[in-house]
Amino acid sequence: MFGYVIPDRASLSPEAQSRYRSAYCGLCRRIDALHGLRGRFSLSYDLTFLNILLCSLYEGETPADSGISRCPVHPVHGVLWRSADPTDYCADLSVALHYYNAQDKWQDDHNLLALGYSTLLDNSTAEAALRWPRQCNAIRACLAKLTEYEAAGSTDLDAVSGCFGALMAELFDYRQDRWAPELRSIGFHLGKFIYLLDAYDDLSRDKRRGAYNPLRELSTHPDYEEEMLDIFELLLARCAQNFERLPCVEDVDLLRNILYSGVWLKYNCKNAKRTGKPDAS
């Protein structure tokens, strides 16, 4: 359910692409510093977006760091990285999200790889939970609730997607300060979008396997594609509306690129395959 909140690289300037890569590498570097090499597997585009958003919103309020370093992925030529306090926050959340998700897969499917990975992240997640108990409790509770919905075969899209939305709202609410309403709304609506887009993307496969998918019933409607597009547009409009209320200056064009264009890339790619038309994005 990760990897949907991505930049539209084709529409980014070289400078913006460099800014994105440095934030991505900065998050990876802080995950490694806090949780070791095993934690690097939890690196995601979605938490990179949150890292960039929070670093922009709280620019100047916390010390920022940057540099050029080698790493296991780039052992020869050093790469530019940058980080600040919100980066450490996102590093902890990255590990916690993948830990609880792996535990969920083990409990649901007895996936041995998931069990092994969650075991590797046991200590790291315990440390993250001590620093961010509210957020980690929300991850655990919301994933458990999602399991209940899935076991019941729920087709209540608002309730099921809202569960993941509630999880993301807690993660976006970094400080519970004056910007909490806007951040929570961005997280909530983006979380619903991610959940439903993931279900939309997996629908054909889930039907073949007889697996749960909340869109199974809606997909029988003759205007299913139009309904889904309306839902996605509404959710992202709410995200954008609340984002524009934030006083972000640093990387604002990069953030807009992700929210207004990047998040649509996988949807557009899916529809290009379905219709046989070239992806215009």
Q: What role is predicted for each listed range?
A:
Residues 1-185, 192, 196-233, 241-251, ...:
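Acidic catalytic motifs of isoprenoid enzymes
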Residues 254-260:
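Short, electropositive alpha-helical surface patch
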